[in-house]
Amino acid sequence: MDMKKRLMLELRNRKAADAKELVLDNCRSDDGKIIGLTSEFESLEFLSMINVNLLSVANLPKLPKLKKLELSDNRISGGLEVLAERTPNLTHLNLSGNKIKEINTLEPLKKLPHLMSLDLFNCEVTMLNNYRESVFELLPKLTFLDGFDADDQEAPDSDPEAEDLEENGEDGEEDEEDDEEEEEFEDELDDEDEDEEGEEEEDGEEEDEDDEDVPQGEKRKRDLSDEGEEEEEDDEDDE
């Protein structure tokens, strides 16, 4: 599913300005850019675009209230200065599984005054010597890197087992309901085009059916009457 269609699906007739959370995971951006997301999403606080084939966040709109941004499993290699310009209140950023190779690529994040948590799992930069020390030195206001603070204390609410229980428990039932609603809404989107195409054909069929429903004798009288009216009009024109 492309990103624009997924946006419509997630909104479900809500106004963009009212949305506080938006999940676009696993949809596709053919050109590697963010598509369809605009500054109308001014109230957005959580945005997830995991595995959407992103190469860049250059066209990310201004989202002044955004606090948490999930960008894992994409192909982003730089251009992070955009985040400082357009998401000034960001507190959590997940760039795991991207093409971040050098510490200096993260330098623009210094301009995010509220950034507390940064995840870079499965990025090449994590293989560098003194990786953790270097990141904490570069970003002194950062509290957690890859789920741990500078003293290797684990961040709260990051227990994988607890998260699994929540996802497989109550959230599991909600996810099933959401999936069903998404399928229904997606079918409605697909049916809209078919309905528009079918309306013209139905109009033509209705006209044919109207003629067939009229008894043959009455239809003959109606045709003769129409012809008579045309002859009278011709006579009046001659006079």
UniProtKB/Swiss-Prot annotation:
Gene Ontology molecular-function annotations: histone binding
Location in or out of the cell: Nucleus
Disulfide bond positions: none
Domain of life of the organism encoding this protein: Eukaryota
Biased composition annotated in UniProt, kind: Basic and acidic residues: 216-225
Location of region: Disordered: 149-239
Domain named LRRCT: residues: 123-165
GO biological process, one term: regulation of apoptotic process
GO cellular component: nucleus
LRR repeat spans: 16-40, 43-64, 65-87, 89-110
InterPro entries, per database record: AN32, Leu-rich_rpt, LRR_dom_sf
UniProt cross-references to Gene3D superfamilies, sorted A to Z: Ribonuclease Inhibitor
UniProt biased composition (Acidic residues): 149-215, 226-239
Keywords per UniProt: Chaperone, Leucine-rich repeat, Nucleus, Repeat
Family: Belongs to the ANP32 family.
Function in brief: Multifunctional protein working as a cell cycle progression factor as well as a cell survival factor. Required for the progression from the G1 to the S phase. Anti-apoptotic protein which functions as a caspase-3 inhibitor. Has no phosphatase 2A (PP2A) inhibitor activity. Exhibits histone chaperone properties, stimulating core histones to assemble into a nucleosome.
Domain notes: Histone binding is mediated by the concave surface of the LRR region.
PANTHER family, sorted: ACIDIC LEUCINE-RICH NUCLEAR PHOSPHOPROTEIN 32, ACIDIC LEUCINE-RICH NUCLEAR PHOSPHOPROTEIN 32 FAMILY MEMBER B
Protein name: Acidic leucine-rich nuclear phosphoprotein 32 family member B
